[in-house]
């Protein structure tokens, strides 16, 4: 579940943000942006077909909305308040009405144009902290889940007997990333694009100055009030042709996700082409004399060993990073992983590369609030100006000292110039190298096939040479 326990950064920003007149102005500006895009007819607004006119205000309003939905009381308790009394309100799937994509569609604004808010999201160069944006993205995803949920039998005033958790980030594709300003508001908008029995796929956009800067596909899961079992969600029924097309694309993604997991080189035996790549890499570093036992390993020119291309850190999470179940919320994990990955990419590139994509972010286990976090970012593949990273998050229980892997992320960065090639020196590293190569190919495919609003009959190809 997303972070809904944070305190506002400044009392002045809170007063300004929560003023109804400011919220009205925000929504009015969003409508102007949409009208502008419609008049341009350039297909830049992929989500126009799902507009519902609903505006949730600012991201602080979103936080308060989630708190009100789940009946969250202020204060930290080592044992969260029992919600077992809400189990009797848990509906059956048949009692939940069907919902369309417009029902869950909403917009919210991250008001970076206000100075007190901006300070939280800016780095020392005056640029936007991408890790902070990932926190807001995760929070907004939970809000969309609440928007989709409709329980006709729930009495008025009773908290929603649900918990929503991040299950998977299929992809976060960044565009116009070098033009994101820390002095302009960022708009988040999105909707549910597919549902299972207790799972939902969400499509979310981040926009600034009427331009899309990121598109995310996220999988969320619903749990009951006590987080002891899955909970059913409203079935999604497309309301028109555009929603039907989006729904069909989501079904295809779901099939690909299942197939991708079963074909990963980290889970199954390498293919013949993978083995050929292993052999070619071996020859590059060992030479042709394979009979020499004590032959020194040779590093080709302008290359670097994978074993030397990583950065790691240990963190102690605190209650301020928790969700209502006293687990570390997914947004904090995403922010931390993105920031450590950026450091690893910077050191390898010798500059400040720009993030291009995050994909296949797995959430294996929840992180307890008393956990120590070990985050390690490995450079596993490079191609010209691109750097592919594998970032692993491990939890170390503060009591038992048992270490478990909780998250795995795959990130792509682009440097200003050509970077050193990274090469593996062990079998495990070679598997990571092949997997990184496959992830980079998936990123290229994502960039090469990105499509926009069908009505415009245009396809934007932003793959870079």
Residue positions per predicted region:
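C-terminal, well-structured subdomains that either form a transmembrane helix-short loop-helix hairpin
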Residues: 324, 332-337, 341, 353-385
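HotDog/MaoC-like acyl-thioester-processing domains
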Residues: 31, 37-86, 178-184, 189-270, ...
């Amino acid at each position: 579940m997303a972070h809904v326990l944070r305190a506002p950064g400044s009392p002045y920003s809170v007063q300004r943000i929560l003023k109804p007149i400011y919220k009205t102005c925000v929504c009015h500006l969003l409508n102007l942006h949409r009208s502008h895009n419609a008049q341009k007819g350039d297909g830049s607004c992929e989500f126009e077909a799902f507009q519902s006119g609903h505006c949730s205000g600012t991201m602080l309003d979103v936080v308060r909305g989630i708190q009100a939905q789940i009946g969250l009381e202020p204060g930290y308790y080592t044992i969260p308040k029992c919600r077992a009394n809400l189990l009797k309100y848990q509906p059956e799937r048949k009692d939940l009405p069907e919902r369309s994509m417009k029902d869950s569609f909403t917009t919210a604004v991250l008001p970076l144009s206000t100075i007190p808010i901006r300070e939280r999201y800016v780095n020392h160069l005056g640029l936007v902290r991408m890790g902070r944006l990932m926190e807001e993205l995760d929070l907004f995803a939970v809000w969309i889940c609440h928007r989709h949920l409709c329980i006709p039998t729930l009495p008025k005033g009773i908290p929603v007997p649900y918990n929503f958790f991040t299950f998977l980030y299929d992809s976060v594709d960044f565009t116009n990333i070098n033009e994101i300003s820390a002095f302009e508001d960022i708009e988040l908008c999105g909707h549910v694009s597919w549902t299972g029995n207790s799972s939902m796929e969400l499509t979310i956009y981040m926009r600034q100055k009427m331009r899309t800067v990121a598109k995310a596909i996220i999988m969320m899961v619903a749990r009951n009030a006590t987080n002891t079992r899955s909970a059913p969600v409203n079935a999604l029924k497309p309301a028109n042709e555009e929603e039907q097309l989006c729904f069909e694309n989501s079904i295809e993604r779901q099939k690909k996700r299942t197939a991708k997991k079963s074909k990963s080189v980290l889970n199954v035996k390498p293919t013949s082409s993978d083995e050929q790549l292993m052999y070619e890499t071996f020859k590059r570093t060992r030479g042709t004399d394979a009979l020499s036992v004590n032959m020194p390993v040779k590093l080709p020119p302008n290359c670097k060993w994978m074993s030397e291309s990583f950065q790691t850190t240990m963190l102690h999470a605190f209650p301020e990073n928790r969700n209502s179940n006293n687990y570390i919320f997914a947004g904090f994990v995403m922010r931390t992983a993105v920031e450590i990955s950026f450091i690893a990419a910077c050191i390898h590139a010798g500059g400040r590369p720009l993030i291009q994509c995050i994909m296949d972010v797995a959430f294996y286990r929840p992180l307890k609030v008393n956990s120590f976090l070990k985050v390690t970012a490995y450079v596993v593949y490079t191609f010209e100006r691109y750097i592919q990273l594998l970032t692993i998050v491990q939890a170390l229980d503060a009591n038992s000292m048992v270490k478990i892997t909780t998250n795995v992320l795959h990130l792509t960065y682009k440097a200003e110039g050509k970077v050193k090639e990274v090469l593996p020196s062990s079998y495990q590293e070679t598997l990571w190298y092949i997997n990184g190569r496959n992830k980079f190919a998936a990123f290229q495919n994502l960039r090469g096939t990105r499509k926009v609003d069908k009505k415009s009959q245009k396809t934007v190809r932003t793959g870079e040479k």
